UniProtKB/Swiss-Prot annotation:
SUPFAM superfamilies documented for this protein: Ribosomal protein S20
Source organism, top-level taxon: Bacteria
Natural source organism: Mesomycoplasma hyopneumoniae (strain 7448) (Mycoplasma hyopneumoniae)
Function comment: Binds directly to 16S ribosomal RNA.
Protein name in the entry: Small ribosomal subunit protein bS20
InterPro entries attached to this UniProt entry: Ribosomal_bS20, Ribosomal_bS20_sf
Amino acid sequence: MANIKSKIKSITKMQKARARNNAIKSRVKTAIKKAKIAISTDASNKSDLIAKAHSEISKAKSKGVFHKNKANRKISRLNLFANTYTTPAQ
């Protein structure tokens, strides 16, 4: 444990930020998982869940939790997953 007052404060701040970031990452993972399940089962609300997942990813990007390239990659992969399930196999 740190003995210096400023380091104690910075550790506390880092712990709060880590908890906040982990909560945001968890929301993103849950939204993606729900969207993928809806796409796989061809649920009626799949477009809403895809939009919600895109929104959560964009929020994480704007808050600095995800790098812009990582956020774009996640969105792209979700769209690719949706397109492979919705287009008929030829």
